[in-house]
UniProtKB/Swiss-Prot annotation:
Active site, UniProt feature: C334 (nucleophile), H422
Family membership noted in the UniProt record: Belongs to the CobB/CobQ family. CobQ subfamily.
Name of this protein: Cobyric acid synthase
Gene3D superfamilies, sorted: 3.40.50.880, P-loop containing nucleotide triphosphate hydrolases (3.40.50.300)
Function: Catalyzes amidations at positions B, D, E, and G on adenosylcobyrinic A,C-diamide. NH(2) groups are provided by glutamine, and one molecule of ATP is hydrogenolyzed for each amidation.
Species in which this protein is naturally found: Cutibacterium acnes (strain DSM 16379 / KPA171202)
Pathway listed: Cofactor biosynthesis; adenosylcobalamin biosynthesis
Lineage of the species this protein comes from: Bacteria, Bacillati, Actinomycetota, Actinomycetes, Propionibacteriales
């Protein structure tokens, strides 16, 4: 057997979650299924057990499928460092850089690696559910495409098209995608799903019939908006999906502000905080919001130095310094931790000109040295006797310049905390203990609910909810039977 490709009419149409749900439904049916995304462009990544790096979305999909995540499931990961340059992760390891001008011409070696990974999965599993990237109708990118219709043509995959009705114009998006494809690609379109619908889908019926009449594509169903599900996203659009600026906030909530850096990475670190009842997490670029919060988080960054410069221009660096003087909690994770340190050395020019010395915010007695070798590792340790694990994705090597209280692998000075570990806050006891301390420090009455679902249990429940919705509203059997 082989696979199918789930493509979308746009970024954030819902491809990742549809693939997640399909993987879980196939697993329920006893199918040995694996996810695959030839190329992912995302700064939200995860370290596998073998030390390889893949997109968080594919890691989640592997969890839904009940298989061990590997680099074959996301053989090419592009991590944007600037608007014109991406860092390449090839089969889970650093693979150089890709300039914007090379995007359509310099990708043959990436395609070969991606398709070889697909063949590897197809040879060892019953079914491969592939996820496309962006839209398959970007005809300016057709040359060299290996993740959308290029993959479908190469591997003879039927394509399920996902359209997002929540943003409006779904019928035009479905028809427009079909219209822009050539005849060979159209022949691979097996049908479509309308995603994120709110209301009575009977009102859609005439439009769906018209789309089918014009294109020959059948509708596999209308998937409703599923509230309360915010699983690992890959797009910047998805950061903070659980909270929108301006939403009403319970005054008794523990208020957590997360700085939205231009090159924010692994923003999923705060998902677990957002899942706690009574914790209000807001991703923001507003200095006033950062000042008012009980806890301020500086998350990961793919471009630490440029995001540090932005932090200063935005006025948030002044807020961070003021909070430290006032004894108010600030925590930095990976790139955010490095910004809190005294100096950043870049001898090999990882982010700046070789030999540069960049002044940090100076709130932690630590020096950062950007090493040529990238660290990719799963890490384990304790904090106050609590077992904690995390994962590391960084070039920066941190050295303490004087004695400071240890915090996981990092340090803690007064109200300022720093760690290189992503994923630490996914551990329930650690997260709840740390947040409770932060609440007491802020004079907040918030305390964790001991009977509440933990982070991993909550994620599993969300996957099940998605799969249930897919089975209830979409002709899943018809989709799975497309596999030949």
């Amino acid at each position: 057997m082989t696979g199918i490709l789930v493509a979308g009419t746009s970024s954030d149409a819902g491809k990742s979650l549809v693939v997640t749900a399909l993987c879980r439904v196939a697993r329920r049916r006893g199918v040995d299924v694996v996810p695959f995304k030839a190329q992912n462009m995302s700064n939200n990544s995860m370290v596998c057990a073998d030390g390889s790096e893949i997109g968080r979305a594919q890691y989640l999909q592997a969890t839904a499928a009940g298989v061990t995540p590997t680099s074959a499931m996301n053989p090419v990961l592009l991590k944007p460092g600037t608007d014109r340059r991406s860092f390449v992760v090839l089969r889970g390891k650093p693979g150089g850089v890709l300039e914007a001008g090379e995007y359509t011409t310099g990708r043959r070696y990436l395609a070969e690696a991606a398709w070889a990974a697909y063949d590897e999965l197809a040879a060892s599993h019953d079914m491969v559910i592939c996820e496309g990237a962006g839209s398959p109708a970007e005809i300016n990118l057709r040359r060299g495409d290996y993740t959308n219709m290029g993959l479908a043509r190469a591997k003879n995959l039927p394509v399920v098209l996902v359209g997002d009705i929540d943003r409006g114009g779904v019928l035009a998006s479905l028809f427009g995608t079909w219209a822009l494809l050539d005849d060979d690609d159209r022949a691979l379109l097996a049908g479509y799903i309308v995603n994120k619908f709110r209301g009575d889908d009977a009102i859609l019926a005439p439009g769906l019939e018209e789309i089918t009449d014009r294109t020959g594509m059948p509708s596999f169903g209308v998937l409703p908006w599923v509230p309360g599900v915010w699983l690992d996203g890959e797009d910047a659009l998805e950061v903070g999906r659980w909270r929108h600026e301006g939403d009403a906030v319970d005054p008794s909530s523990l208020r957590v502000a997360v700085v939205r850096f231009p090159r924010i990475s692994n923003a999923t670190d705060v998902d677990a905080m957002a899942g706690e009842t009574g914790v209000d997490v807001q991703v923001t670029t507003n200095p006033d919001t950062c000042q008012a919060a009980d806890v301020l988080v500086l998350p990961g960054s793919r471009s630490t130095v440029s995001d540090l410069e932005w932090l200063r221009r935005s006025g948030i660096a002044d807020v961070v310094a003021r909070r430290a003087e006032q004894g108010r909690t600030v925590v930095g994770i990976c790139g955010g931790y490095q910004m809190l340190c005294r100096t950043i050395l870049d001898p090999d020019g990882q982010e700046t000109t070789p030999g540069s010395v960049v002044e940090g915010l100076g709130l932690l007695p630590v020096e950062v040295d950007f090493a040529a070798t990238k660290t990719l590792a799963l890490s384990h340790g304790t904090w106050r006797g609590i077992e904690v694990g995390g994962y590391e994705i960084h070039h920066g090597v941190c050295r303490s310049l004087e004695d400071a209280e240890a915090f996981l692998d990092g340090v803690h000075v007064g109200p300022v905390w720093g760690t290189m570990w992503h994923g630490a806050f996914e551990h329930d006891e650690f997260r709840r203990t740390w947040l409770a301390d932060a609440a007491r420090h802020a004079g907040s009455s918030w305390r964790p609910h001991s009977d509440e679902l933990g982070y991993q249990a909550r994620r599993e429940a969300m996957i099940e909810t998605l799969a249930d919705a897919l089975e209830a509203h979409v002709d899943v059997d018809r989709i799975l039977h497309l596999v030949r």
